[in-house]
Amino acid sequence: MKFHPTRPFGLYFEFFIIISFFFTSESTGDVESFMKYSNVAFSEGLAGFDSLAHVYQALLKKSTCYQEVAATLISKCSLLNTELTIDNRIHSAIQMTLCDFERSQILAPSECVRGSQSECVSKLESTSTWWLSFTSHFHDVNHLCRLANLEMQKELSIEVNMNVTLVQKQFLEMVILHLRNFESVTDKMNQRIDKFDGKFNSVIENSFKDINFRVNQEIMGLVELQNHQQEGMVQQKEILSTIKQLKSEIFDINSFFANFIEESAGYSNSLIEKLNEKFTSENAIALSAIGKYTSEFSAFMEKRIKNLITTTEDSLQQSVQSNIDFVNSGFQPLYDLTIQLKEELQSLKRLSSEQQNLQHEQILQWKSDFLNVSKDHLKVLQQLRPLIDIVEKFMNVYFKGLSNIISSFAFIGFTLFATLSSLFFKVLKIHRRPIIVFGSLSIIFIHIYCFKITSWVNLYGWITCTIARTLSFIKLNIRTFYLTAFLCALLNFLRYLKYRNSKKDTELSLFLPAPEECNIYHNEHIQVQEDNYLCPIENSLIDLFGSENNKEKLGKQENVRFAFLNSESLEQSPWWD
C-alpha cells in the first residue's frame, strides 16, 4: 500500500492510538506486577477487572456505532451465558472495524457491507492497518463478554444478599413482636400472682387469728381445771390433817379410855376403813373426770387442726394448680414458636453456608480466568514492544521533519517582518541607518538559524546557504535577504520530498509483514502456498487466537500474521535509516 499525498497522516496515528489503547491501558501495570510477584494476592489481582471495565466504558463513550455493537455483544453474552463462538467474535470484530472506518471517514469495503463474512475477512487481510484493527477488536470481544457475565454475576450476588437481609429483618421483627406478647403475658401473670399473694396472706392471717382465739379459750379452760384440781388437793390435805387430828384425838381418847378403846377397837377400825374407802373412791372419780375432759379436748383440738390443715392445703393446691395451668397456657405458644424459629435459623444458616461456598468457588474460578487472561495480555504486550519502538522511532523522525519545515516557514516570517519594518520606517520617513542596523541583525540571526537546520543535510545545501550568507553580508538589501530565505526553505522542502518519494514504502516499513522464512532458533524454512506463511505451531513465538482448533476455523493464516514481530524479524532497514 503506497503512501498517498492526500491521505492524512492522522489516519495512521489514529490506528496506532486504537491499538495502544486496548493493549497499553492501566492493565499494563497489573501485568507487570504479576510478572514481578508470582504469588500475588487475589485482592490485588481483582484490579485487572477494572482495566476491562475501562475498555467497556471507553466503548460506551465513543460514537453511537460503537455503543450499538457493544449492546448487541452484551445481549449475546447474556443469552449464551458462555464464551462466544468464533463466528460471533469475528462478526463483532468486523462491526467494530466498520465503526473505525466510519469514524475515520473511510469508505468501507463492499465485501464487508454486502458480502459474506469470509469475504470481508479476506478483504481486511489485504490491508495491514485494516487487519491490525480487526485483530485488536477480535481479542477484546471475548474480554467484553466476560466483563458482561461478571456484571450479571455481581447483580445476582447483590440480589441474593438483599433477600437474605430481608429474611433476617422479617425474622427480627417477628422475634420483637413475640417478645412484646411475652412481656404482656408476664405482666398479667405477675399481677395475678400479686393478687393471689394478697388473698393468701389474708386467709392465713384470719385462720391464725381464729386458731389463736380457740387455743386461748382452751388454755383458759385448762387453767380453770387445774385450779379446781389444786383446790381438791388442798381439800384432800385438809381432810388428811383432820384425820390426823382425829387419830390423835382417838389415841388420846384410847389412852384415856383404854378400856373403852379395847372394847370399841373393832368398831373404830371398821369406821376408819369405811372412811378410807370413801375418800379413795372420790379421788378416783375426780381423776377419771379430769382425764376424760383432757382427752376430749385433745381430740377436739387435733380434729380442728387437721381440718384447718386440709382446708389450707386444698386451697393452696387449687390456687397453685390454676397458676401453673395459666403459666403453661401462656408459655406453650412461645415454646412452639421458639422451636419453629430454631428450625428456620438452621435452614437459613445452611442456605447461607451453601451460598458462601458457591460464591467462594465462583471467585476462585474468576481468579483463575483472570490470571489466564493476564498471561495472554502479557504475551501480546511482549510481542508488541518491538512494534511500539518502531512507531516511536517513526514518530520522532516525522516530528523532526515537521519541525524543520516549520522552522523554514518561521524563517520566511522573519523575512516578511523585516520587509514590513523597512516599509514602515520608509513611510514614516525615518533615517535609513536604523533600518540597515535592524536588517543586519535580523539577517545575522536568521543566517545562524538557517545554518543550524541545513548544515547537516548535504554538501549542496551547505554550499548554497554559504553563498547566500556571503551575498547577504556583502550587500545588505531585501533582495539578498529573500534569496537566503527562499533557498533555506527550498532545501528543507526538497529534503522532505526526497524521503517522501523514496523507493521503500513508509507504511510497509512501519507495519512489517511476516518474513519469507520463520526467524526461529534453527532457521527452519517454511513453504509459501497462496501467500500463506505456514510455520510450525510449536516454534511460534505467540498464538494470538487461543487454541489450535481455532486456527483451522479462521481466515488465511491469521494466527501467524503477527507471530514473528521479534528482534530478528525487524532486521529490514526502514526509510529513516
Curated annotation (Swiss-Prot):
Residues 426-433, 492-577 are cytoplasmic. Induction: During conjugation. Glycans are attached at residues 163, 372. N-glycosylated. The keyword rRNA-binding does not apply. Pfam families: Tht1. Keywords: Endoplasmic reticulum, Glycoprotein, Karyogamy, Membrane, Nucleus, Signal, Transmembrane, Transmembrane helix. Residues 30-404, 455-470 are lumenal. It is found in: Endoplasmic reticulum membrane; Nucleus membrane. GO terms for biological process: karyogamy involved in conjugation with cellular fusion; nuclear membrane fusion involved in karyogamy. One of its GO terms (cellular component) is endoplasmic reticulum membrane. Residues 1-29 form the signal peptide. It is a multi-pass membrane protein. The chain crosses the membrane at residues 405-425, 434-454, 471-491. Belongs to the KAR5 family. Required for nuclear membrane fusion during karyogamy. This is Nuclear fusion protein tht1. It comes from Schizosaccharomyces pombe (strain 972 / ATCC 24843).
